[in-house]
């Protein structure tokens, strides 16, 4: 694998090289686990600190958390609908915050100062395994949402306007996780690659605007992933008449 | 990995991104046109239009990104590299 070991003097760009951990019969990508644990830890710490001493007039971290809560609630409510959005708000919020903090953490934290035996630390979402796992979770949850809300009537959705739609709707169930995972993975990896290549060509000043563009795209991608997840769930629980 | 596979992979990777950029390029152009017309007609709706425009841009962009993923697979994780 990886017949182009791109090793540049300034930006060590290593695509397809990982720090492998052996877990039973599984070979897992250690660097992804380390960064995602750091992201999860940071999020947990933020939430614990923010809710420790809650006040009537929110200040500081509590204020930030309440803003996030409002934001996620609005997102979930517009996509899923007034009736069941409460059940799915934690899931949508977790997806959004995890992806957002992963993307920004990969771009903002100078991971390259920490040397690993092979591979490099970076955004966990720049690994296809992470994004596929998240996308499959979304698939499972919209099936669960549909079945638990409507029972077997959920499958009416497949033949909803006409039975001609049946094959397309079945194919859609496979393309949804595929496009969700590829979109996130491709965007984040592309950001990292563009920055690394630019740093290689012009090490000074020029990469900075591209880095800002990357931050912007990463934030939008987190929003898109959460919005689409909410939309799919909303589509599954929607009542047809 | 023989040289003919390498050459074919590199050419295919270039084509995957290049051809994949055509459609979304046209699409983003016409979406931006619509947004600019909308803002010119109704400047107070600029915030809403901008939000929707950026979201739809990201959707169109992801089509090119699919091409990029194929290109990256060909370059870094080529399944035909013997």
From Swiss-Prot, chain B:
The record marks 61 as: Reversibly protonated during proton transport. It is found in: Cellular thylakoid membrane. It is a multi-pass membrane protein. Gene3D superfamilies: F1F0 ATP synthase subunit C. The chain crosses the membrane at residues 7-27, 57-77. Keywords: ATP synthesis, CF(0), Hydrogen ion transport, Ion transport, Lipid-binding, Membrane, Thylakoid, Transmembrane, Transmembrane helix, Transport. One of its GO terms (cellular component) is proton-transporting ATP synthase complex. CDD domains: ATP-synt_Fo_c_ATPH. GO terms for molecular function: lipid binding; proton-transporting ATP synthase activity, rotational mechanism. It comes from the Bacteria. InterPro entries: ATP_synth_csu_bac/chlpt, ATP_synth_F0_csu, ATP_synth_F0_csu_DDCD_BS, ATP_synth_F0_csu_sf, ATPase_proteolipid_c-like_dom, F/V-ATP_Csub_sf. F(1)F(0) ATP synthase produces ATP from ADP in the presence of a proton or sodium gradient. F-type ATPases consist of two structural domains, F(1) containing the extramembraneous catalytic core and F(0) containing the membrane proton channel, linked together by a central stalk and a peripheral stalk. During catalysis, ATP synthesis in the catalytic domain of F(1) is coupled via a rotary mechanism of the central stalk subunits to proton translocation. Key component of the F(0) channel; it plays a direct role in translocation across the membrane. A homomeric c-ring of between 10-14 subunits forms the central stalk rotor element with the F(1) delta and epsilon subunits. F-type ATPases have 2 components, F(1) - the catalytic core - and F(0) - the membrane proton channel. F(1) has five subunits: alpha(3), beta(3), gamma(1), delta(1), epsilon(1). F(0) has four main subunits: a(1), b(1), b'(1) and c(10-14). The alpha and beta chains form an alternating ring which encloses part of the gamma chain. F(1) is attached to F(0) by a central stalk formed by the gamma and epsilon chains, while a peripheral stalk is formed by the delta, b and b' chains. Belongs to the ATPase C chain family. NCBIfam families: ATP_synt_c, PRK07354.1. PANTHER family: ATP SYNTHASE LIPID-BINDING PROTEIN, MITOCHONDRIAL, ATPASE PROTEIN 9. This is ATP synthase subunit c. It comes from Prochlorococcus marinus (strain MIT 9211).
